[in-house]
Amino acid sequence: CIRDSVGSEMCIRDREYIDPVRYISNESSGQQGMALIKSLLKKNYRIVCLHGYLQTKLIISPKIKYVFTPNAKSMLAEAKKNSKVDLAIFNAAVADYGIQNYSKQKIKKKSALNLQLKKNPDILKTICSSKQKPKTTIGFAYETNDVFNNAKKKLKTKKCDYLILNFPVDSDPIFNSKYNNGGILNIKGDYIEIGKK
């Protein structure tokens, strides 16, 4: 979600449509985004929430403005409009790739289908590299291997102030779960473990 004055947050997955019926997306329920919003409300933040397709119930408050952004391109456009904030939290499960050639008609079933993908805009990196970047930026990373080194590389590449690292624990992939597992990494390389909560 992105917030307009005191804090800002970006949340929830998008869809990159192949045709009017089919799409590619990332796994995400939206529970984490709503938990962040609830926490920000307790601290009296005014919030603009940029979101894709939700599987969780919205929190209704006069301090929250919801903006539907169905894909990475539209989410980046809205993020740029709302970048002059004190705090921006980028926890959206944005698809890294979109479809090169969208079909306006439903693609008929074949024995095989080859899709040409194109790289989507990097929202976090674009906003953090902007001259009108938020005062504080927090990115998110979900890693499955070499988690700390990959997270450190992402923090440096994206140029955000903090990175929330999530990774699977035991047999729990964390997705669609009431729990998260991981910690917080800052630009100095300091890591605070949160664990499974």
Residue ranges and their predicted role:
Residues 5, 28-29:
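Short linear Ser/Thr-Pro motifs
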